[in-house]
């Protein structure tokens, strides 16, 4: 059995109009961003990791962007500012998380933003019991504002650990059924999901949590942020789609579930009276030759949706950057921070 923990904790916020923190201000000070935002948020996450370690967790999932550097990543027209505050991986933040993972001999999955040269990712790392990085994942599906300065990932890796095979998705990835379907093809036992929220309304979010797990017979551990993005409700779901740990709404807490991650789902299917590995049966019966339309760049439905101007313009570069500017209360036309 492995003890899985999901951390639900609210970030330490900042005022986007604080000129020392705002990358669009002439008074921007990277040192203040690090001292007022990044390091306090990392330390808060470290406190939660220590708490989970004291409770003998084998793997702990932290939220998306646990160091709260996402808005700076999106400021692509302020390259020097964002380069000064966003960490590389490995770096200061992963070293802090890794030290606690090593202290308690546990795995950590943490959402982070990553700088690779001039490229930025919404990432998540898997850290092993020895404090070393086992692997990392780059978010594939990015929101409009993220696309202003963050680069999409391109694959769905799975990593071997002593408790089972671990895969990762981040936030907006969850909205796309194809994401978990693709990840499931790589055979994870546990899917870790750092996020700011379900993306859907709360009731529909619960449904998708159950269905995504049951559809692919995988365990899922969600770590959400109870914040302005959503009310929280982190949860852990088993292969049968049953919620086995639930953080509830608007709470700062850690939830735990003891799971045998390698235990397959043996039950009846309504037209098949045999008792066998349901996940295995569903994979054996797949018809991938009929799914080709899913990988078409221009499926018939896209033409219909692109006829709507607001959809067509959604990812134009100026629209993306406008969303990033709005996040910083920046009036680009007049080059000023709005009060």
Can you say where each PLM-predicted feature lies in the sequence?
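Beta-strand-turn-beta hairpins that frame and shape the catalytic cleft
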Residues: 1-6, 11-16, 158-167, 190
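Conserved beta-strand and immediately adjacent loop positions that scaffold enzyme active sites
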Residues: 3, 109, 123, 155, ...
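A solvent-exposed, charged loop/short amphipathic helix patch at secondary-structure junctions
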Residues: 17-37
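Cys-nucleophile CN-hydrolase/nitrilase-fold catalytic domain and related Cys-dependent amidase chemistry
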Residues: 33-130, 181, 199-216
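Short beta->alpha transition motifs characteristic of CBS
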Residues: 72-75, 125, 137-143, 235, ...
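Active-site catalytic loop in hydrolytic enzyme cores
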Residues: 86, 99, 115-189, 195-211, ...
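CN hydrolase (nitrilase-like) catalytic-core segments centered on the catalytic cysteine
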Residues: 86-108, 165, 174-258
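C-terminal beta-strand edge segments of enzyme domains
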Residues: 158, 225-339
